[in-house]
Amino acid sequence: MDFKKAFGAEVREVDERTRDGKATRVVSASRIYQTDQSNLWGALTNVKRISNWFAPVSGELYQGGRYQIEGNAGGTITRCEEPLALDLTWELGASISWVTVRLETQATGTCLILKHEMLKDKTSEAHWKKYGPGATGVGWDLSFFGLGIHICNDGEQLEREANLSWMMSDAGKDFMRDSAEAWSKAHISSGENEKIAQAMTARTAAFYTGEG
């Protein structure tokens, strides 16, 4: 498996909104994949294919059903409109957030737009003030990276041992540092103080690379 030319998201944004009258933060990432909507939708929703590039998923994978990602979040699929839109709750421990995915046909392929919305509650804010958007963003960058390899290799499985080896390598750590820095730039563009954003970035990069 060739990791050299692989990359994560192409566009990153940080925003604030409200949900049901409560303040939220939104981390958005997008990328154009050189494939059609149908193939990209299949990579995102087919149980076997999801495990090939992301993680094993179980449950009732249809609108209204519950899903569980092995060793990660679970939740409810609140919208499933093939091949355009997927909405779900993202439940991890006692926390709940919301993920939306949209697929848009472009001249050069299909654009995947992912938004992860989190409440500005006491627990989330403590985490945000320490790590900023990169805590969530770097994780999604790694997912975009894995999906890209899967798409470029005709649906081939991303070998777990090779992936872990790459993540522990200098190249893998550089990828995570670069991702954290890219999220810092998006954070600053949203209005965050540069020094505060850079401090968050340093902590995020240290966490992901195991050097903290």
Kindly give the residue locations of the regions a language model identified.
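Long, contiguous C-terminal modules that act as interaction/assembly or targeting platforms
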Residues: 1-3, 7, 26, 32, ...
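Terminal "cap-and-tail" regions of soluble proteins that handle hydrophobic small molecules
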Residues: 1-21, 119-212
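Hydrophobic pocket/interface hotspot
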Residues: 39-41, 50, 77, 86-88, ...
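Hydrophobic-ligand binding "helix-grip"
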Residues: 58-59, 65-113, 117-126, 205-212
